[in-house]
């Protein structure tokens, strides 16, 4: 199951973004203010997207990214200056002030990419070597 987790130090900002996502039909798994809470929500889903700000109450976005499994992607919402030097792998960025249209399109694109990778993983699992086929029979 793909989960979307919204993490911002200001609970009101996180709730507003969650309401925006729910309004367009996206399923939001959780809203939180700390990276530890986000990791707790991440344990409850197979894969997902973390929508977060640059600095959380207990850690920076880069620390949270390091702690998350590879099945998770991150959408960083921050001013351009915060991520000018580049972003880590698995992190996409949107500049503040954010437009609802840009947020929705970016999340849809990330969800499509995750779906494509999931299908690709399933195909590789189904293809077996002749030795594996012989063991099964």
Which residues are covered by each model-predicted region?
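Conserved acidic carboxylate
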Residues: 8
């Amino acid at each position: 199951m793909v989960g979307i987790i919204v993490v911002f130090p200001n609970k009101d900002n996180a709730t507003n973004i969650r309401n925006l996502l729910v309004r367009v039909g996206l399923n939001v798994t959780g809203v939180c203010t700390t990276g530890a809470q986000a990791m707790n929500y991440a344990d409850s889903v197979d894969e997902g997207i973390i929508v977060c700000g640059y600095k959380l109450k207990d850690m920076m976005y880069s620390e949270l990214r390091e702690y998350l499994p590879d099945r998770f992607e991150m959408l960083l919402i921050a001013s351009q200056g915060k991520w000018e030097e580049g972003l880590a792998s698995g992190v996409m960025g949107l500049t503040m002030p954010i437009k609802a249209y840009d947020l929705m399109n970016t999340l849809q694109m990330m969800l499509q990419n995750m779906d494509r990778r999931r299908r690709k993983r399933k195909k590789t699992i189904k293809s077996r070597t002749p030795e594996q086929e012989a063991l099964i029979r």
